[in-house]
Amino acid sequence: MFIGRNRELETLNGLYRSDKFEFVVIYGRRRVGKTALINHFIDEKKAIYFMGVESNEKQNLENFSKSIIEFGSGIQAETTFSSYQAALEYAFKLAENERVILAIDEYPYVARSSKSLASTLQMSIDKYKDNSKLMLILCGSSMSYMEDNVLAYKAPLYGRRTAQMKIEPFDFDECCTYLRGLSDEDKAYIYGIVGGTPQYLLQMNDSLSVEENIKNTYLNPMSFLYEEPLNLLKQEVREPAIYNAIITAVATGHSRMSEISTKVGESTTVCSGYLKNLISLGIIKKETPYGEKISKKSIYSIEDNMFRFWYRFVPDNASAIARGAENLVYKRIESQLNDYMGRVFEEICTQYLWKLLLTGKMPIEFVSLGRWWGNDHRKKAQIEIDIMGEKDSASAVFAECKWRNENVDLDVLETLVDRSGLFHYTKMHYFLFSKMGFTKGCAEKAKLMGNVTLVTYNDIVRSQK
């Protein structure tokens, strides 16, 4: 069953209906659902689908030829075009009088095996686009390759595309459609454990508990997810050992460049290059305090929840897992799970605020959201604000998120209001997010202030319906 991607499908179908040449670039990290999106889109349409393989030019050209000829003749073909130029010319002619889709999946594999393919595509597009109704789709999992060799200004195909789509992991709302059999609370835990990558969500069984799902995947050496982070690095980068060391450093609390460099034993210049690649892969993110464009206070953290959970709990327990001690390891994880979920809940709350903005329900229409941390000069202490967002120099929203098994008390609201005093806004609105709820004192104060919104986790879940 295909779930989600409504916006992407709407765009693709709109381009399909244009009845003229279209060239769409689709890219995104592995397992995110690009192939599923393409297959769902081309279903019941006249389409040639070809997936490149990590092989030589001869093998890929043979496979490409078969895909095109079988579409054109309706019979299995043994003929191979003499070149990609001849194959593409045939595909363009097939679409002279009717809409035909040509989808080339894993394009980087094909292009790496044939160095002239990009230029051949460019020439074919320029020659035939005005007299063809072909809809060309190039799709790739190597994001750096797609960005540098397809989308970049110096790439041969630059300026030819009519649309591009970077396919991102699902947000929390979309993930919940995969997890309908779970309780509302368990949906949050599963999102925190695997994130929004469809292939990882499919490893979760919504008829089992969170404990059973963790044991069956991360604590099972024979499972797909147990080896996934290292396998993914081996597929994406040339020196997986160094990348693994950097991710491990970040996962163990070394968040600043100098700390990562010291932990890994490489210069900051070297680490910077590796971190840049990890950011492009969607594994690591770089944050600066909200409102500060360039800051020495920048920190790095793991963005992908599957990577974050794996690196926090699997490596240190690898020996016990290998000996089949999943019950013991789970007890260790369970004691830290609510603490781990704190950052996940902030992510869910951030998505909720964006949803309020997009539906016209935000009291202050911010232009962006982020975390803030820094020095409180009044108290000479380092402080944090979970979420803040500015509309303009006069107005902003502030939020605090608490994932804990107790009601949020008045002191949390008072602390947030106090910290907002470090900024010079004249109009402010506050959000308190709570897993469980709020004390009577907190609720009464919020009502009295008039510029406070109290949101429980259940409120967030109900907003999906």
Positions of predicted regions on the chain:
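Phosphate-binding site recognition
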Residues: 1-330
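A cross-kingdom feature that marks ATP-driven nucleic-acid transaction machinery
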Residues: 290, 299-465
